[in-house]
Every structure is written in structure tokens, then in C-alpha cells.
Amino acid sequence: MIGDPDTRRIDSNERLIMPYPSPLKILLAMAFVVACWAYSPTGIHIGLQAYEPGHLALLRFLLASLFMALIAVFKGICLPHWRDVPLLFALGFFAVSLHHVALNIGQQSVSAGAYSVLAQSSPLFSTLLARFVFKDQVSAWRWSCVLLGFVGVVIVVSGDKGLGAFDAHALLILLAAVSWSVYFALQKHHARRYDGFSLACYAVWSGTLMLLIYLPGLGQAVLNAPLRVQWAVLALGVFPSALAYLAWGFVLKHVDLSRATMTLYLIPPTAMGIASFGLGERPTLLVLVGSVVVLISVLALNLERRVGLVRTARI
């Protein structure tokens, strides 16, 4: 009984004995997650100074894979079922391969601040997936939020480079947001048999395997890259790609999902601050206005879900 991890999760007596982390510890974990993921746009921008987008994605996740493998040795993970292997590779494709290659290519001509806002638009696409793929009912309120969100996206893009200079790079960042929405939907509907850490490991490892198509030329790129870029890529592999997922799993274990996701709205302003300090970028007024519009639309989507849960609980 003691050696069975599933029994430990449902044993009420043990739950009383296990110490609950202090609010400060949870708050620090949330702040760590925000800081890690807000660093990504700046880290990618620096990495692209010496690496091609595919090389940068592969190197970043080779580092993340090794780091998570070391943690898995000590922490332990759930072994996958053979029937779940296609699903795990699909998760890796949408969460790692497609998502990060699209982000890297997109950020070649999009500022780090605009990138951080566009990448946060994934809940808007999740709503579209819920309606047109999973055939869920979508309220008029949620449709209004989606429309408002896309208005904000247009404002961000026009404020960043101008609509006259609009090209496929911003669309690729939106593609990355769509990819993340598909990953989240697959995880929600089909991957409940695994804990968060195991699922993150398999998504990272399978996604990294698919990124190996970019292996030719990577060694020479590593040798030619300056030290500043190497440190930036190392930080990308360890912090946003590995440690942040562990910290996020810790947060979700002790805080309900709707409340925890509220902290993610701090990522775009934090990312803009990091980019301002590290890259000397100054977001334009239109980018700031569009950012507020996008974040309000996404926040309104989540608030509607939360109100619905409260009403259901009262009934």
C-alpha cells in the first residue's frame, strides 16, 4: 500500500499529514513561471542572431530533453502505454516541433513585445476549436471575446510594423498559437492517464525527435555562435522549456486552474520589460493598446468559464 503512488493520492489520512506549501512558496512559483516564459521572446531574439530557426528550436529542446531526463531519473515518470504512443507524438508535434519552429521563424521580423502578445492569443483559437472540431456550444459572449481578441491582434500587428509591412511572420506566430491550442485540446481530451510531469517529458522528448530533421549543420552553428548567444540558448533550454513546466505543475497541484491561469496575463507586460532592458526595444502606443485589447478578450473568456463553474457549484 505504501509503495503504490495512486493510493497515496486518494488516501485522506495521508492528505492530512502532508504539509501544504505556504502561500509565499506558491506565489514565488507563479512569479518564477511568469519570469521564465516572459524571457522566451528575448532569448529567441538573441538566439536568432547566430542560429537558423530550426537549429535554435532543436538545440533548445536537446538541452531541455537532457535536463528533464536527469530530473526524471530522480523523480520518476509513468511509463507510456503502446496505444498512447501516437498521441504522445502528436502532443510533441503541436507543443514543441510546429509551435517553436513557427515562433522562431515568426520572430525574425516581429518585435519581442508583439510576439509575447500574439503568442498569448491561443485561448481565442481554443474557442474556435471547441466549436468547429469538438462541436461544443459557444455562447454569444465567447464569440464577442474572440472577435474583440482578433481586433486586438490586428492593432498589435499594425502598431508593430504597420499593416503595409504585414507579412507571413506575424501569421506564423498566430499559427504557433493555434498549435498550442491543439496541444491543449488533445491534452485535455485524451491524456488524463498521465501526471503533468510525465506528459511534459514525453511531449518534449517526442517533439525533439521530430526536430532532428534540423540536425545537419547544427554542430558548425554551435561552434560559430558567440558566447552571449550560447548563454541565451542555454537559458531557453533550462528555464522556459523545463523548469517552468515543473513549477507550473506545482502551482496547478495547489491552485485551481482558473485562478492559476490569471497569472499568465502578466507574461506580455513582463516580456516587454525584459525586451526593453535586454534588447532596447520600446513598444509603440498601438502595440500597447492592442495588447490591452487582446488580454481583456482572453481574460473575459476565462472569467465566463469561472462564473459558469461557480453557478454549477451553487446548483
Where are the predicted features?
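Glycine-/small-residue-enriched transmembrane alpha-helix faces in small-molecule transporters
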Residues: 2-58, 163-189, 312-315
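Helix-helix packing/entry segments at the starts of transmembrane helices
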Residues: 57-59, 114-121, 186-208, 237-277
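Hydrophobic transmembrane alpha-helices of multi-pass small-molecule transport proteins
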Residues: 68, 89, 129, 138-158, ...
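Juxtamembrane helix-entry segments on the extracytoplasmic side of multipass membrane proteins
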Residues: 22-27, 49-54, 58, 80-86, ...
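C-terminal-most transmembrane helix of multi-pass membrane proteins
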Residues: 19-20, 28, 57, 61, ...
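Transmembrane alpha-helical segments that form core, pore/gating elements
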Residues: 68, 126-128, 132, 163-219, ...
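Specific transmembrane alpha-helical segments of multi-pass solute transporters/efflux pumps
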Residues: 36, 40-41, 69-119, 155, ...
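Specific alpha-helical transmembrane segments that line the substrate/conduction pathway
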Residues: 55-66, 95, 100-137, 142, ...
